[in-house]
Amino acid sequence: MRILLSNDDGYFAPGLACLAEALSVIADIVVVAPERDRSGASNSLTLDRPLSLRKSHNGFYYVNGTPTDCVHLAVTGMLDTLPDMVVSGINDGANMGDDTIYSGTVAAATEGFLLGVPSLAISLAGFSAGNFPTAARVAAEIVRRFETDKLHGPVLLNINVPDIPYDELQGLEVTRLGRRHKAEPVVKYKTPRGETVYWVGAAGPAQDAGEGTDFLAIQRKRVSVTPLQIDLTRYGQLDAVKEWLNSHALGSTRS
């Protein structure tokens, strides 16, 4: 089995190193990751300049682009054959609910999915680097399961692992995405030169953390596994929007 690894924290991130160590025992791995932290890059591609691919001293490849760039470059321009799986992570922090829209970790897995490769995004739902081995072990177990018993149809799974030792996990739960409240406002600062600058505010707290959500699974010390899809269509509103638009002919609102 051949696995392409990537992330959004950068090729030097300890979570990526921990994941690579765990998966190298059960598969041939190739690591292609951003040259710097690209958290929050979402599904962006670099289109205004060429990309470079370099190899670091630890054998990992790194790209001067986004997580999506890394997977796209690796699958369409670097590797001779499609990998059997793309695994993105281990992210330093949760990717639950609305986080998935912004997450570079999820985006790297999404790009693999779009290119026809079964893909996993794995995140540690906390900031304790000491528990990266917990998430790495979970990732290895899910990869082994996939190798012996493949899921039918396209696969894009978002996995969040509680920030606790492996022996304290209370199992695994298939979940839906929860929701967060809107993010905190930007934080304004003055530089020593008097320039006003802004930091993006913190993510909002959980709003929908009810039964079946990723938030609740993590609260219960359970691994959250959420199947994702790309289709953003709001099917329940199609008829309402159609009726709304059909009630006004084009040009009827012009003054």
UniProtKB/Swiss-Prot annotation:
Cofactor section: a divalent metal cation
Which Pfam families does the annotation name?
A: SurE
Q: Which residues bind a divalent metal cation?
A: 8-9, 39, 91
Keywords attached to this Swiss-Prot or TrEMBL record, sorted alphabetically, are: Cytoplasm, Hydrolase, Metal-binding, Nucleotide-binding
- Give the superkingdom in one word: Bacteria
Segment forming the signal sequence: none
Q: Which HAMAP family does this UniProt record tie to the protein?
A: SurE
Family to which this protein belongs: Belongs to the SurE nucleotidase family.
Location of this chain's protein in the cell = Cytoplasm
User: According to its UniProt record, which reaction does this protein catalyse?
Assistant: a ribonucleoside 5'-phosphate + H2O = a ribonucleoside + phosphate
Stated name of the protein: 5'-nucleotidase SurE
GO molecular function list: 3'-nucleotidase activity; 5'-nucleotidase activity; exopolyphosphatase activity; metal ion binding; nucleotide binding
Q: Give the function comment from the record.
A: Nucleotidase that shows phosphatase activity on nucleoside 5'-monophosphates.
Q: Which of the seven top EC classes does this enzyme belong to?
A: hydrolase
GO CC field: cytoplasm
Q: What is its EC number?
A: 3.1.3.5
Cofactor binding note: Binds 1 divalent metal cation per subunit.
